[in-house]
């Protein structure tokens, strides 16, 4: 029995260590076990003019990420403010760049009125979306655009949408009119680039669309951090994400050209993504442009524009929460920015089920409780077999100890006697291991579901729990977790080895300290799971005792 219990605890402990190691690697930190493999430099064949990972495209204009207030007076731009039912933001006339974007009604549980600022450009933080032209001395994100007159800046009344347009200076015989379309209830912004040839010679420019941000971490509770960095999606190579550390080491790996897909910047709970027109060939680039500034973008060639002609290039810009159902309806594969890693195949059905439960009960905390009940019901046959095996082992523990005492000088005879005892009593010393092994993928999957789901952010449960994505403010759930683990230890047979017995008593304390910093929603799951496990084990053990008494 002591061997089996050791195996169970080692499996549980290693699963927790693997979770922490996965968290480390998602943050660009080295793995505790495996060195980072050097990835292939490119994925697939790069078309002429594409970039290789880590190489700056030669024709991209130099960046200008300084905050407007730090710019020289002669080149000072202005900020055009706008408001919708989901956004408040600013467009910088330098480049017609979307330099600030806040998501209203996305505050946390402590400060419900606090909006989340996704895009921003200050002295301490840079994150923005911008576009421009390549292929000549054409308008780009460094030029000062002029807002068109008599424009609406706010979504009012019953209006479904409004537009803001900006006109560039004429450069290289080309003028650009950039138009942003904001729609009620939508986190997708239409971006139309109208390219007018006002010169005397044909021009063949390319349009670039990029997301620029620094490597500042997102503020989230300890043990609750997830991936931050650029990502690329194409139909051929699917979802490819890169840490800022990968880019620093020139180890980023992504498709460099495609005629489909999107590029994104991903962070905990929120993401932004450029979604160009599908079926149009484009090059993709990911690079470091300043000591702590990175960009991911696409370059889309434009057909030759004759003098007097105009060409429109349309794209969509997503900036919002990582809500799976919404993302699925915006673009193929966009829901993958909510990244579950290697447990996606289990995590996605779990989230679907959690979402279905929530649609009926209307509370994410109670949804977690009910999901835990369902999971325990599904695994009940396996759990019952495990608890029955443990009960049989507990019943023969005195005889096992007697055999160990009798043959303590002869390990071979002791093992032989123990095997004979197991055979006589029809006990499998490892009978309780299988249910634990099978449930580990579910354990890890639900961890990532609860950690990654923006729906938990600001979601209350009862009484003192006002935000399931934050740690328990009074540590009540972690204490209950410690108590439940201690009770489970008491229900199981005591290991004959005193050192091992002390280790079994210490493990609940060690795990509970770690859970002090986990999100309340995650700890809630484990508390409910432990309570149900105790109830199951007590019931099955009692039933076995009654059956044995009747048989006697």
From Swiss-Prot:
Signal peptide: none annotated. Residues 35-59 are annotated as: Disordered. Residues 42-59 have a biased composition (Low complexity). GO terms for biological process: protein insertion into membrane; protein transport. GO terms for cellular component: plasma membrane. The chain crosses the membrane at residues 3-23, 364-384, 430-450, 504-524. Its main location: membrane. Coiled coil: none annotated. Keywords: Cell inner membrane, Cell membrane, Chaperone, Membrane, Protein transport, Transmembrane, Transmembrane helix, Transport. InterPro entries: Membr_insert_YidC, Membr_insert_YidC_N, YidC/ALB3/OXA1/COX18, YidC/Oxa/ALB_C, YidC_ALB_C, YidC_periplasmic_sf. It is a multi-pass membrane protein. PANTHER family: CYTOCHROME C OXIDASE ASSEMBLY PROTEIN COX18, MITOCHONDRIAL, OXA1. Required for the insertion and/or proper folding and/or complex formation of integral membrane proteins into the membrane. Involved in integration of membrane proteins that insert both dependently and independently of the Sec translocase complex, as well as at least some lipoproteins. Aids folding of multispanning membrane proteins. Belongs to the OXA1/ALB3/YidC family. Type 1 subfamily. Interacts with the Sec translocase complex via SecD. Specifically interacts with transmembrane segments of nascent integral membrane proteins during membrane integration. This is Membrane protein insertase YidC. The gene is yidC.
